[in-house]
Amino acid sequence: MASPDRSKRKILKAKKTMPLSCRKQVEMLNKSRNVEALKTAIGSNVPSGNQSFSPSVITRTTEITKCSPSENGASSLDSNKNSISEKSKVFSQNCIKPVEEIVHSETKLEQVVCSYQKPSRTTESPSRVFTEEAKDSLNTSENDSEHQTNVTRSLFEHEGACSLKSSCCPPSVLSGVVQMPESTVTSTVGDKKTDQMVFHLETNSNSESHDKRQSDNILCSEDSGFVPVEKTPNLVNSVTSNNCADDILKTDECSRTSISNCESADSTWQSSLDTNNNSHYQKKRMFSENEENVKRMKTSEQINENICVSLERQTAFLEQVRHLIQQEIYSINYELFDKKLKELNQRIGKTECRNKHEGIADKLLAKIAKLQRRIKTVLLFQRNCLKPNMLSSNGASKVANSEAMILDKNLESVNSPIEKSSVNYEPSNPSEKGSKKINLSSDQNKSVSESNNDDVMLISVESPNLTTPITSNPTDTRKITSGNSSNSPNAEVMAVQKKLDSIIDLTKEGLSNCNTESPVSPLESHSKAASNSKETTPLAQNAVQVPESFEHLPPLPEPPAPLPELVDKTRDTLPPQKPELKVKRVFRPNGIALTWNITKINPKCAPVESYHLFLCHENSNNKLIWKKIGEIKALPLPMACTLSQFLASNRYYFTVQSKDIFGRYGPFCDIKSIPGFSENLT
């Protein structure tokens, strides 16, 4: 039986929808069970050795239902029809002979019985009935062998039972009244279908003896089919004859032998049927197995096709992934190449810039060397020109010596009162360096030379009567003028002997109320110049040497705190040092000169960025307040500046504070004071 699906097997149920093979198997099992039940019943009903037994009723019913070959069973029976028909023919010929013998024996009894009956009633001999029925069964066996074998089996069982009864009965019973059964066989055969065949045999024997004994009633009934046939009473005839007993015994023996032969033939036929059925079932199983194998092959082919399709999909997907990976690798390689190329270009640019910078540095160094050569030539020219005129006048040399002493003492540039010249200088850029060179000619004409260095200024004066004003314009250009005097050539020697080669004035432009001015006033005589120089020296000494107390002054302003971002950078450096301040008053022009310096510079201190100037002045109307009057960018020490604009006050107080490049402020210097002006200086 082929299963529809290997994964899901259906549960077999006895329903109308059951397949034909299953139905046939169920029918065969039911038939085999019925045969076994009949055999057990026969074995239990046979007496074991008792010659006399009580009246008993034995009933055997064999139901055989043979339907005509229907549409559902036709396919299963066609395969075995030929083999079964041949065996049934042979079997039927073997069975007909004992049946005829039994029938002839019974006809003899019938003749004996019928001799005592009335001539009007004629009974049909049972031999003819049985032979006709056997022939009918043989005719129907061609259509269905199983039906014929069951019919003959029922006849054999019936005769066997009768023979057993007759053998067990004593002769006294046989000498009595014997009632022979009338067998009625009903066979219905359709034109094309044989629905049912029923053989009903009934035997009622009642023997009554003249000695008032009860007779044994023996009933043997064979039922074949689903519908039982009603029992019909037969004619009972009383026969008293002793001659018939021997014939009955002989017929019983013959019936026994025929029954045994039939049983042996039946067993052989049953075995042949079993083998045929087994072969049929084996063929069916082989057919179902073949179908299952075909289905399995189909399913395996489908599975293989599905596997091939899935493999193709996987390979296509892997190809796509491989292509994407290659594209990604190419893009990464391109990016790396671009990055390396960019770095290479940057390096090439740096090398080119280095070459450019080296060229620029070479040019700058060449310019510096050129300037140095020019400065040296100017200095040599001045020395060579001024040496012959150094000893021309003693008075001029005295004035020069006095002015040199003042410059050495105060460390600042002071204009000589003899010359009545004032010099004011304002640096705009600490990084720029310049030098002013003055070339003197033999005919005492004015000559001015300028260079790119603005931090160094060289001044030479030809005559004490000359004034050399230096004014600063917004473009930070310095001009040095030298004029000729009309008095005497001795004044030139006196001016050269002073050696005022370098005078620096660092007054910053833009200080609060401080403007640099350079008035020009001619001097008439040497006596006035000498007296003025004598007056300025004690004033400067008094301003420096007089100690004063500044308790009445307000406290100095507190510097702002440094930025927190610069704390880490300033760990290894110290704040700026405390400077030393000096104050001096000048008259022409009227003003105050400030100078400051640091004697011992600590290398651990950070570089100074700028210096801050503070002023406090006494006034009856105003309070004492410290004011920041200016901020000067740091230059190499010592430094100086000149203040020319003041408000009227009794006394002025000055202090200086330095600031480094990190924004830290150093301590204030010692406060210095100087007498004030009665009038406002503008």
From Swiss-Prot:
Kindly state a single biological-process term from the GO annotations of this entry.
Answer: regulation of DNA-templated transcription
List where Polar residues composition bias occurs: 137-148, 418-451, 462-490, 528-538
Residue span of region Disordered: 120-148, 418-491, 513-538
Q: Which residues carry this modification: Phosphoserine?
A: S416, S488, S521
Q: From the UniProt record, list the coiled-coil ranges.
A: 328-378
Q: Which GO terms describe its cellular component?
A: nucleus; transcription regulator complex
Q: Where does the UniProt annotation locate this protein? A: Nucleus
Principal localization reads nucleus
**Source taxon at top rank:** Eukaryota
Q: Which residues form the Fibronectin type-III domain?
A: 575-680
Gene Ontology molecular function: any one: transcription coregulator activity
Q: Which Pfam families match?
A: ATF7IP_BD, fn3_4
Keyword tags: Activator, Coiled coil, Nucleus, Phosphoprotein, Repeat, Repressor, Transcription, Transcription regulation
Q: Indicate the quaternary assembly.
A: Interacts with MBD1, SETDB1 and SP1. Probably forms a complex with SETDB1 and MBD1.
- State the similarity comment: Belongs to the MCAF family.
Q: What does this chain do?
A: Recruiter that couples transcriptional factors to general transcription apparatus and thereby modulates transcription regulation and chromatin formation. Can both act as an activator or a repressor depending on the context. Mediates MBD1-dependent transcriptional repression, probably by recruiting complexes containing SETDB1. The complex formed with MBD1 and SETDB1 represses transcription and probably couples DNA methylation and histone H3 'Lys-9' trimethylation (H3K9me3) activity.
| Name of the protein described by the UniProt record | Activating transcription factor 7-interacting protein 2
Q: What is the lineage of its organism?
A: Eukaryota, Metazoa, Chordata, Craniata, Vertebrata
* Gene giving rise to this polypeptide: ATF7IP2
